[in-house]
Amino acid sequence: MSRGISTFRNIGISAHIDSGKTTLSERILFYCDRIHAIHEVRGKDGVGATMDNMELERERGITIQSASTQVQWKGHTINVIDTPGHVDFTIEVERSLRVLDGAVLVLCSVAGVQSQSITVDRQLRRYHVPRISFINKCDRTGANPFKVCAQLREKLSLNAHLMQLPIGLEDRLEGVIDLISLKALYFEGESGAHVREAPIPEQYQADVKKYRDELIDAASLFSDELAEAYLEGTETDQLIRAAVRAGTIAEKFVPVFCGSAYKNKGIQPLLDAITYYLPDPTEVTNTALDLDRAEEPVTLSTDADAPVVALGFKLEDGKYGQLTYVRVYQGTIKKGAELFNVRARKKFKVGRLVRMNSNQMEDISEGTPGDIVALFGVDCASGDTFCSGDLNYAMTSMFVPEPVISLSITPKDKRSADQVSKALNRFTKEDPTFRSFVDPESNQTIIQGMGELHLDVYIERMRREYKCEVETGMPQVAYREAISARADFNYTHKKQTGGSGQFGRVAGFIEPIAGQDYEFVDQIKGGVIPNEFIPSCDKGFRTAVKKGTLIGFPIVGVRVTINDGQSHPVDSSDMAFQAAAIGAFREAYNGAKPVVLEPIMRVSVEGPQEFQGSVFGLINQRRGVVVSSADDEQFSRVDAEVPLSEMFGFSTVLRSSTQGKAEYSMEFAKYGKAPQGVTDSLIKEYQEKRKAEQR
């Protein structure tokens, strides 16, 4: 069986928005005979890219959900995940990387390493995913793959080396030179399907020698055999490839390829590179946590006969019902077999088992180690682990960022109200960064997400997929409250209303802590608060920190210590001590010098150098702090930290200030103390809102 697994490659295609990765995926499908005609991304031909199967994606020309597809190339099975390039959809990238064994990092030959490339690089490192890089758009004006390869080394600190040189650039791009086989490759025919090998043109010989020497010199660090052969002048293609493969799998080397997906140049050698240099499932160490042994890490095997361990990494509710995308790590999932959902503690039977090819599906009878398959009708959440037999393993949970923006939505009519709840139920299951709840005070439905575009897409999906019209309020920032000093409390909760009353006294102090939201410390001695009521105190304090009294947002960074108290043999109860804890916290809170924290975003603005001054001005106007800036002959990039509250409508202002030539991305960086003026206006706004609600 391991021979079959060794031909598997699970790869993701990751990049900055508009680097051309969906176009690249489309060409991969075409050359691997998955589709029989090439469609462009923005749907000029009325079809749209195959991998962009959601109607909204085809219209906007951005990839929102990671479509999964399986292709065959020269005896290898490649599972391709096309991931979104927009920061608002980062959870999709995170989820697909969690189940991949390798990645193709796509870069634009003109723009080079951009802000989202840096985010993707950080994610690849987090999940230890080896990568190769493809410098796309070498046919564009200003294309410079040499500069981009240098940026990979300088900006991302990668040991990146060109494996190919372009033959011509911009509108004169003809093909590529393979630095290992020392052949010129030309892509002929209407769709570049025929690859013609030819001798290297004379004018490129000097460059070929220079870059080949650099490549072998770097690769020989991973192979003593290659180092010796190189000194003796007897190096072979096989030795070089083996050394590059070893360095790539160890995440210490990044082979760089170039071409133009749009012009059908360089895709077949990239497919070869995926099979040559990226690991198969047996070459990747995957671990699970044994829940029966205090979450002790366990290394999984790729034995098809072992008990099943699989991860449900994506949920999708399409025209066929709920689909759960699953990566099989160990054992074989068979149709009709019984599996156990470790989180939900429930067994279920595998009904229909399919393989998804974008939005097409094929029925299969089993999924083996290293495979990515989809299950029908399984009630689960994204990130659930499925096991067979007596295994009680959980795959390490995926990192899920907290939402930073919220929006109130109001259905326009009764029918829409019913559909909204269905839509929200589905979306929150599909996407852990999209959340919804009903505000108990205003009774409004609130949705939360990673940015304006993120929420826009879900509102649009409600309209299209559920035919429900909603009115949206102003976007709201997810503020937090915190304390900046220690304060004592000594609070008695006493209620006598005939019959048994309520009594509980708690004393202690609250103080600020760094690095966590809440900590409870029990220093009660002598049983002045009976042991059974200590959890009640903890529960009461947890309730109190859910909503601060300054502006009504959760309180973070608080340690609560209780060291004294009193109980009554009849009147003390769970509810009495919960109420005492809530009262005690509120008593101490104002004395602990509370402050408002606001989310600070990491903002990257990229555009022509001539607009750099305007960009600095826009950031300064928004209370932003420039962290770094870089520029070359044409482009400049400004990295800044800006409060989220100042970023609403930024895209419109940026467009008008830069003639539409600059773009920006942002992601959550940290919480920071809000200036006094901002705090005062938020407090005033909150007090007015409370008064209005009480009328």
From Swiss-Prot:
GO cellular component: cytoplasm
Residue ranges of every copy of the tr-type G domain listed in the record: 6-282
Origin species: Treponema pallidum (strain Nichols)
Molecular function GO labels: GTP binding; GTPase activity; translation elongation factor activity
InterPro entries: EFG_II, EFG_III, EFG_III/V, EFG_IV, EFG_V-like, EFTu-like_2, G_TR_CS, P-loop_NTPase
Protein name: Elongation factor G 1
Pfam families: EFG_C, EFG_III, EFG_IV, GTP_EFTU, GTP_EFTU_D2
Amino-acid positions noted as binding GTP in the UniProt annotation, renumbered to this chain: 15-22, 82-86, 136-139
Superkingdom as given in the UniProt entry: Bacteria
Cell location: Cytoplasm
Role of this protein: Catalyzes the GTP-dependent ribosomal translocation step during translation elongation. During this step, the ribosome changes from the pre-translocational (PRE) to the post-translocational (POST) state as the newly formed A-site-bound peptidyl-tRNA and P-site-bound deacylated tRNA move to the P and E sites, respectively. Catalyzes the coordinated movement of the two tRNA molecules, the mRNA and conformational changes in the ribosome.
Keyword Cytoplasm among UniProt keywords: yes
Family note: Belongs to the TRAFAC class translation factor GTPase superfamily. Classic translation factor GTPase family. EF-G/EF-2 subfamily.
Gene: fusA
Keywords in alphabetical order: Cytoplasm, Elongation factor, GTP-binding, Nucleotide-binding, Protein biosynthesis
